[in-house]
Swiss-Prot record:
UniProt cross-references to SUPFAM superfamilies, sorted A to Z: Nucleic acid-binding proteins, Translation proteins SH3-like domain
Family: Belongs to the universal ribosomal protein uL2 family.
Gene designation per UniProt: rplB
UniProt name for this protein: Large ribosomal subunit protein uL2
Lineage of the organism: Bacteria, Pseudomonadati, Pseudomonadota, Alphaproteobacteria, Hyphomicrobiales
InterPro entries: NA-bd_OB-fold, Rib_uL2_dom2, Ribosomal_uL2, Ribosomal_uL2_bac/org-type, Ribosomal_uL2_C, Ribosomal_uL2_CS, Ribosomal_uL2_dom3, Ribosomal_uL2_RNA-bd_dom
Keywords: Ribonucleoprotein, Ribosomal protein, RNA-binding, rRNA-binding
Gene Ontology biological-process entries: cytoplasmic translation
Gene Ontology molecular function, alphabetical: rRNA binding; structural constituent of ribosome; transferase activity
Length: 278
């Protein structure tokens, strides 16, 4: 889809760049596939802020997207329409099965209403089909890749994202991710063919602070602009540089310090995404 720019009738329209969504369905989502979504404002069950700079924003309805694709194996479904989803950057597709059941899936690029999609052990390599990564040829572009068999897709789910199959060995498949990381995934893990829709999402410009507030994002304050009680960089008469290496509000070094602690899955990462920065 193309990008939309606007005549600078107001200051905020001057910088505004949006994705043209005129081809998407304009009605409401399927009620049976939705549920209410209450906003947390970044607070936990004790009411304490666990994620800063969140709150407000437009009320949303949660669409139940099928990330597993294992319900009706071998049954071809028809794409009824492509929809906007406020809860993610990608678009979603409503698919109809022959028995009348409906489902939402992540819409890949080049998927159109009327197309047929199928999930199964051995599927054609066309956008929207899903199957085990071990049955797909080397070089295939995939998205919505499972890390654990049957748990549902976890890798490459946001707008324009994808992973590429670069090898197979002893029941495992080697994937190259957009970050540059290469990792092993079990060959029985499901993945969907193609790259995720809405690749132009990276080019949008919101044009004004209020448009970020509509998304539920509050102003992000710098540590050096705070008081010493609020941040390690706070305080000082006039403008100061912080006086120490950059840290988070909790004193953990930022800008490059490794924080990964899951050693159990280190064996599956063949090449770290940090290697290409050196």
């Amino acid at each position: 889809m193309a990008l939309k720019t606007f005549k600078p009738v107001t200051p905020s329209l001057r910088q505004l760049v949006l994705v043209d969504r005129r081809e998407l369905y304009k009605g409401k989502p399927v009620k049976a596939l939705t549920e209410g979504k209450s906003s947390s404002g970044g607070r936990n069950n004790l009411g304490r802020i666990t994620v800063r700079f969140r709150g407000g924003g437009h009320k949303r309805v949660l669409r139940n997207v099928d990330f597993k694709r294992r319900d009706q194996l071998g049954v071809a479904a028809t794409v009824e329409r492509i929809e906007y989803d406020p809860n993610r950057t990608a678009f979603i597709a409503l698919i109809n099965f022959p028995d009348g059941k409906q489902s939402y899936i992540l819409a890949p690029q080049r998927l159109q209403p009327g197309d047929k999609v199928v999930a199964g052990e051995s599927v054609d390599i066309k956008p929207g089909n899903a199957g085990p990564v071990g049955s797909m040829p080397v070089g295939t572009i995939v998205h919505n890749v499972e890390l654990k068999i049957g748990k549902g897709g976890a890798i490459a789910r946001s707008a324009g994202n994808y992973a590429q199959i670069v090898g197979r060995d002893q029941g495992y498949v080697t994937l190259r991710l957009n970050s540059g990381e290469q990792r092993l995934v079990h060959g029985q893990c499901f993945a969907s063919v193609g790259a995720v829709s809405n690749p132009d999402h990276m080019n949008i410009s919101l044009g004004k602070a209020g448009r970020n507030r509509w998304l539920g994002k509050r102003p992000h304050n710098r540590g050096v602009a705070m008081n010493p009680v609020d941040h390690p960089h706070g305080g000082g008469e006039g403008r100061t540089s912080g006086g120490r290496n950059p840290v988070t509000p909790w004193g953990v070094p930022t800008k490059g310090k490794k924080t990964r602690s899951n050693k159990r899955t280190d064996v599956f990462i063949l090449s770290s995404r940090h290697n290409r920065k050196k």
